[in-house]
Amino acid sequence: MLKLQEKLKNDYGLVFNDEDLLKTAFTHSSFTNEERLPKIANNERLEFLGDVALSLVISDYLYRTYPEKLEGELSKMRSSIVRTESLANFSRSCGFGEFLRLGHGEEKMGGRDRETTLENLFEAFLGALFIDQGMDEVRKFIQHVVIPHVKNDDYVKVIDYKTELQEVLQVGGETTITYNILKEEGPAHDRSFVAAVYNNGKELGRGLGKSKKVAEQKAAENAIKGQNHVS
């Protein structure tokens, strides 16, 4: 972790007070499984926290920066910024993958550059940063790494199928859209998910993805295209 600490200090002016917390953020579930460590020793709990922190900072930035945009437009922009591919690219730009502690099997299968793994790593780092130094430092880091891309409109045109489906259905009147994860397959470090989307209790489509977010987006996409099958 010493090299990681040096990188964070040199690139972002960050010095973690709790090195064990930083180590946890960079520990994949495949590593804890192989080393027979407790499940809470991997970065999944920090990922959960970082996801919320990221969403809040991005939402606040978009709200203040685009006073002319309606809620639906802001939701589309936020969704495109925090989608799997975007967060994986942010993680790559920070060079985080190099420092991730992976199990040998996951390493051999290319897990170090897997999109969902890098997405989760980026969120876990934000969660650790929040605990260690508070929301102000999380905001500064996001403004340094993420916001420049938002200013360039890099993510405005990315399709968010969940929001698009909601807009299509709302034209017909009152609607209640829900998503449900129907199936989880594969080992903990290489999960696949099948999601279904419903409108007022009626199933509209299903989707397959390497994360719950991706599966739900695929289900919404298939619903829009009228394809009620898994793909």
From Swiss-Prot:
Catalytic activity: Endonucleolytic cleavage to 5'-phosphomonoester
Signal peptide: none
Cofactor(s), by name: Mg(2+)
GO molecular function term, any single one: ribonuclease III activity
Any one Gene Ontology BP term: tRNA processing
The enzyme's E.C. designation: 3.1.26.3
Pfam short name (any one): dsrm
PROSITE patterns linked to this entry: DS_RBD, RNASE_3_2
Record keywords: Cytoplasm, Endonuclease, Hydrolase, Magnesium, Metal-binding, mRNA processing, Nuclease, RNA-binding, rRNA processing, rRNA-binding, tRNA processing
Residue ranges crossing the lipid bilayer per the database entry: none
Gene Ontology cellular component annotations, sorted alphabetically: cytoplasm
Residue stretches making up the RNase III domain: 5-134
UniProt-annotated binding residues for Mg(2+): E47, N120, E123
Gene3D superfamilies, A to Z: 3.30.160.20, Ribonuclease III domain
Active-site residues (renumbered): D51, E123
Location(s), subcellular: Cytoplasm
Subunit note: Homodimer.
General function of this protein: Digests double-stranded RNA. Involved in the processing of primary rRNA transcript to yield the immediate precursors to the large and small rRNAs (23S and 16S). Processes some mRNAs, and tRNAs when they are encoded in the rRNA operon. Processes pre-crRNA and tracrRNA of type II CRISPR loci if present in the organism.
Protein name (database record): Ribonuclease 3
Organism: Lactococcus lactis subsp. cremoris (strain SK11)
